[in-house]
Amino acid sequence: MKKTLLAAFAASLILSSGAQALETSVSPKVTQLTVTNPTTGMYVGNSYSFYNCGVHSYVRGFAKEDGRSWKARIITISSGMLSFHDLKSYLTPHEMDPYFKDGNKKPFDVILLQGMSSEPIDKKRIPTFKKYLKEHVETARASGAEPIVVVTWARQDKPEDTRRLADSIIAEANANSAIALPVGLAFAESLKARPDLILHQKDKSHPTAAGSYLYGAMVYSLLFKKSPEGFKYPGECEKPLKPEDALFLQQIAWKTLCDFYGWQK
């Protein structure tokens, strides 16, 4: 009961507070999707997106509770950078592929691009990150899909990287006129308010179930421009969250998006 009250109190403080500066020096150029009520998507990334049965499962859980038509494919490579992915191949019809059924030439409404955690801030990797982000954004658009660039989170033992990652990724999303999804900023906001709610695995890098839940809530809220607050969906992979923790993360996700994009709460 005590933990429940503490969680509720922390969440109420966040919701009642005025807009506070998120940990980034770069404002987004694109603040909402052009596609309305997307029904199909693809996630391209690495284990950050695949942990805990995959972020796609969390988004599907929110969509199912909300009664929305939504399906998505996830393609991840362990420790994969954006350069590891052949997006053009992923968007080529393959035999028995349901996304290209009946000659469908626009299989996905949105494509989420999630790079390796260090490539946007590692001096040796930054040029490759920029090159392939640009290439993948162009490839996504050529297929009729809207690209979404995922802003990843800092390692648990390097919270100072939150701003570095956000600034680098958002700047490149802006350079390509693509929308950035500030997942890493939401991680930072959650950890400020609820340091007891662990978002990183013991390796201090990959997400716990709570981290994946927050990631999924961010994706869902961006796709449909809707707050997930109040959803009963507890999570995936036999790792359900406590109701008070799920509510807190729902609130963090929506507040972060509203503060970042300038949306009305």
Predicted feature descriptions by range:
Residues 1-4:
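Positively charged n-region of N-terminal signal peptides that target proteins for export
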Residues 8-16:
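Bacterial N-terminal signal peptides
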Residues 19-21:
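Boundary at the C-terminal end of the N-terminal hydrophobic targeting segment
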Residues 23-40:
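N-terminal low-complexity, Pro/Thr/Ser-rich intrinsically disordered segments
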Residues 40-42, 49-127:
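Conserved SGNH/GDSL esterase-like catalytic core that processes O-acyl groups on lipids
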Residues 44-45, 150:
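Short hydrophobic segments within beta-strands
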Residues 99-209, 221:
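Alpha-helical cap/lid subdomain in secreted, periplasmic
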Residues 206, 216-265:
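Conserved catalytic region of serine esterases and O-acyltransferases that act on ester linkages
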